[in-house]
Amino acid sequence: MRQLAFFFFFLAASTLCARARVHEMEFDQARQVALIVARFDNITVDDRTIVMNSMDTRTEAGFIPGYYSFSIIRESDSPARPDETIRMYVVSKKTADTWELNLCTHYSFPELQKFQQDLMHKTGANAADDPDMPKAIGCANQAQMKPAAE
């Protein structure tokens, strides 16, 4: 009888822990977030002249551990001119919170907020699950907000 009680206790405890655990979003979801932010910045990623690349390819942990990172590049059509990095977006794997890495700009606008809420509902996260993001990406002191366009 004790063994049966212990089994049910263990099963209930592991189920509660599994529900409490926050899952991370998938790479493709983070890429979608970065594309939403790029459109907000009036950047059209067309995969010909303006491309989006992952910056997370060098190590398994990624460019910045805990975050997906994407660069948007205008590719040169001439060997005499270099490619131009237009933006570098960093997306939290937990909350889909998004920053531009070089400008230290935090994004918040209705379309992005809705997408973030939908993702957090799926992953079990909430907006407070990644409070150290500005510090982790090196933007703690110079952060600025990019609100929705009026």
Question: What is each residue range found by the language model?
Answer:
Residues 1-4:
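Positively charged n-region of N-terminal signal peptides that target proteins for export
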Residues 9-18:
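Hydrophobic h-region of N-terminal signal peptides that target proteins for export
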Residues 21-58, 122-130:
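Short, non-transmembrane alpha-helical segments in secretory-pathway proteins
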Residues 7-8, 98:
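A broad, structure-centric signal for solvent-exposed, well-ordered loop/edge residues
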Residues 47-97:
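Exposed beta-strand-loop-beta-strand "reactive/processing" segments of non-cytosolic proteins
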Residues 28, 32, 36, 74-77, ...:
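Contiguous hydrophobic segments
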Residues 102-150:
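C-terminal partner/receptor-binding element of secreted or periplasmic proteins
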